[in-house]
Swiss-Prot record:
Domain Radical SAM core: 137-382
Catalytic activity: L-aspartate(89)-[ribosomal protein uS12]-hydrogen + (sulfur carrier)-SH + AH2 + 2 S-adenosyl-L-methionine = 3-methylsulfanyl-L-aspartate(89)-[ribosomal protein uS12]-hydrogen + (sulfur carrier)-H + 5'-deoxyadenosine + L-methionine + A + S-adenosyl-L-homocysteine + 2 H(+)
Cofactor note: Binds 2 [4Fe-4S] clusters. One cluster is coordinated with 3 cysteines and an exchangeable S-adenosyl-L-methionine.
Entry GO MF terms: 4 iron, 4 sulfur cluster binding; aspartic acid methylthiotransferase activity; metal ion binding; protein methylthiotransferase activity
Protein's recorded name: Ribosomal protein uS12 methylthiotransferase RimO
Domain annotation TRAM: ranges: 385-453
EC id: 2.8.4.4
Disulfide bonds: none
Gene Ontology biological process terms, A to Z: tRNA modification
Gene3D superfamilies per the UniProt record, alphabetical: Methylthiotransferase, N-terminal domain (3.40.50.12160), Nucleic acid-binding proteins (2.40.50.140), tm_1862 like domain (3.80.30.20)
Organism per entry: Burkholderia cenocepacia (strain HI2424)
Family: Belongs to the methylthiotransferase family. RimO subfamily.
NCBIfam families assigned: 30S ribosomal protein S12 methylthiotransferase RimO, MiaB/RimO family radical SAM methylthiotransferase
Cofactor(s) needed by this chain: [4Fe-4S] cluster
Length: 453
């Protein structure tokens, strides 16, 4: 029997791109290809790229160059694959003309066609059964669940719609089947992602689907309720990311706070507010009423006191005045957001914000970002201190002789903080990766917690 062909894989970018990579690798394995852990052991290499900001573009171009140098046979996919150069030609083909093929994002079929052209699939392979959950690039105990592709918004700083297109929602039964397979495979935390989670179903007019004989609308609230019910059967968590602040978000908060879903639909919202001043938000083409946002945040916390709110912001957007930036700082202090990230505005090729007047010098943008983070970290530290002395449920991510590292319901993997857990003193309290344990919090800083089982 001939040896199975081997494909190397490089995955860059956000969790949405990671899911694309998982789907491609799942298909490769289903067709009998092996995945190589090195360039020299691969017959060709697939590079899944990111093209959102300049740093990501350069990282992707460098990765393609490295793969060409080390292997020589490279297929490129992902967001950067859809990007044109200043001359109008494909950017990747212009910089790296020796690549075998280039596709855009969410293009499993096109990638497989390119692989078949340059590395025919085995005719008589002994194919391992691919698990129903597919091939995952995350640890076994958590996984990303992508519910839609694309975005209908046209934020002036963003080029995602030009690369991934308008919103296309996955059928609700398909999403639920994938979620069930993931839970069956041992996943303890499901992270729901998309470009715009709140808009799920808008493109199909909230069409009714069916799962296990029950009708479920293709709508965020209905999907979250169904996922919460399913997660409860497996003692698992569901976490929501990329939740655009539509009014419909208000309907999800009670699912986090009460009834059968409490403890399974996590009291956690990742809501990208981006700014707080109405004029800046208007220039960004974002919802523009900070006072209403504050009212909503207060109402959310009244309904669900344990709610954690994560958000991202942009400092130094074109035309932002010092007064407008101070409004943003006041908003951060008053809203008391738990987890906050901030980017100094950086022009992205193809974004309409590049045409706005009032571009700020690099040093002003960076200085405002630093001031923003100073305020945000102070707010975060105060909120973290309130957890000292409490006993929290923690999902263990790592275990060593020094103890464990895990996360609470308030912490998404890779972007939020962690809990450093002391080694278990008794055999009955020992834990392993993927376990839920009760941890008494003994210390905190602005980002992480410390505790003991």
């Amino acid at each position: 029997m001939s040896q199975s062909p081997k494909v190397g894989f490089v995955s860059l970018g956000c969790p949405k791109a990671l899911v694309d990579s998982e789907q491609i690798i799942t298909q490769l394995r289903a067709e009998g290809y092996e995945i190589s852990g090195s360039y020299d052991g691969a017959d060709l290499v697939v590079v899944n790229t990111c093209g959102f900001i300049d740093e990501a573009v350069q990282e992707s171009l460098d990765a393609i160059g490295e793969a060409l140098t080390e292997n020589g046979k490279v297929i490129v996919t992902g967001c950067l694959g859809a990007k044109s150069s200043a001359s109008g030609s494909n950017l990747i083909e212009e910089v790296h003309p020796k690549v075998l093929a280039v596709t855009g994002p969410h293009a499993v079929g096109e990638v497989m066609q390119a692989v078949h052209s340059h590395l025919p699939k085995p005719h008589d392979p002994f194919v391992d059964l691919v698990p129903a959950a597919g091939i995952k690039l995350t640890p076994r105990h958590y996984a990303y669940l992508k519910i839609s592709e694309g975005c209908n918004h046209r934020c002036t700083f963003c080029i995602i719609p030009s690369m991934r297109g308008d919103l296309v929602s996955r059928p609700v039964a398909e999403v639920m089947l994938e979620a069930e397979n993931l839970f069956k495979s041992g996943v303890k935390e499901l992270l729901v992602i998309s470009q715009d989670t709140s808009a799920y179903g808008v493109d199909v007019k909230y069409r009714t689907g069916f799962w296990n004989g029950k009708p479920i609308k293709t709508r965020m609230t209905d999907l979250v309720a169904a996922l919460g019910e399913l997660a409860a059967q497996y003692g698992a968590w569901v976490r929501l990311h990329y939740v655009y602040p539509y009014p419909s978000v208000d309907e999800v908060i009670p699912l986090m706070a009460e009834g059968a879903f409490k403890g399974h639909v996590l009291p956690y919202l990742d809501v990208p507010f981006q700014h707080a001043h109405p004029e800046v938000l208007k220039r960004m083409k974002r919802p523009a009423n900070a006072e209403k946002v504050l009212e909503r945040v207060q109402k959310w916390r009244e309904i669900c006191p344990d709610l954690t709110i994560r958000s991202t912001f942009i400092a130094g957007f074109p035309g932002e005045t010092e007064e407008q930036f101070e409004t943003l700082l006041d908003f951060i202090r008053e809203a008391e957001l738990d987890r906050v990230g901030c980017f100094a505005y950086s022009p992205v090729e193809g974004a309409t914000a590049n045409d706005l007047d009032g571009a700020l010098p690099d040093e002003v943008r960076e200085e405002r970002r630093a001031r923003f983070m100073e305020v945000a970290e102070e707010v975060s530290a105060n909120r973290m201190q309130r957890k000292v002395g409490k006993t929290l449920k923690v999902l263990i991510d790592e275990v060593s002789a020094e103890g464990g590292i895990g996360r609470t319901a308030a912490d998404a993997p890779e972007i939020d903080g962690v809990v450093y857990v002391e080694p278990a003193a008794k055999a009955s309290k020992r834990y392993k990766v993927g376990d839920f344990v009760s941890v008494k919090i003994t210390g905190a800083d602005g980002h992480d917690l410390w505790g003991e089982v």
